[in-house]
Amino acid sequence: MTFEQLIPLIIMAFALGMDAFSVSLGMGMMALKIRQILYIGVTIGIFHIIMPFIGMVLGRFLSEQYGDIAHFAGAILLIGLGFYIVYSSILENEETRTAPIGISLFVFAFGVSIDSFSVGLSLGIYGAQTVITILLFGFISMLLAWTGLFIGRHAKGMLGTYGEIVGGIILVGFGLYLLFPI
């Protein structure tokens, strides 16, 4: 693979990773420990490897009609997660709130990586080099998720008790933006 072929993939990886960054800003406003932040970033990175890989494999066999469905599902997942965070911030006390672990972490990672599935479909149709592509997507998304989580964690300290509500609203807003781009 030449440098000229690598540049578009890096740009595409940053574009896909910006979803993870933006959403991680909101998620970072939860009371997360450093270890949880690292685990969340790695999980997002892994999903940004798995989803485009599946998309690339299926892209060799399927048409691009599933791109809109993946985009819609990702937006709905983000909106639902955002509403859940706002709900839990308002109705539950600090001690009962939990960080995204288990199923909720997988839903979160799936939601921010589902766009990479549709990109993988397209790249699979065009025969992109699978290993380099998915490793770039995963690594850059992981770094951007960590950046968003750390910035969100710092912003929570400045926003006080309203930090999680703001984070949930960011998730809802980002999901709505995916549904209705400006």
Swiss-Prot record:
Designated name of the protein: Putative manganese efflux pump MntP
UniProt xrefs under Pfam families: Mntp
PANTHER family named among the record's database cross-references: MANGANESE EFFLUX PUMP MNTP-RELATED (PTHR35529:SF1)
Record gene name: mntP
Domain of life: Bacteria
Protein keywords: Cell membrane, Ion transport, Manganese, Membrane, Transmembrane, Transmembrane helix, Transport
A cellular component term, taken from the record's GO annotations: plasma membrane
Localization: Cell membrane
Lipid bilayer topology: Multi-pass membrane protein
Family, per entry: Belongs to the MntP (TC 9.B.29) family.
Any one GO MF annotation of this record: manganese ion transmembrane transporter activity
Main location: membrane
Chain ranges passing through the membrane: 6-26, 37-57, 71-91, 101-121, 131-151, 162-182
Annotated function: Probably functions as a manganese efflux pump.
Record carries keyword Manganese: yes
Magnesium found in the keyword field: no
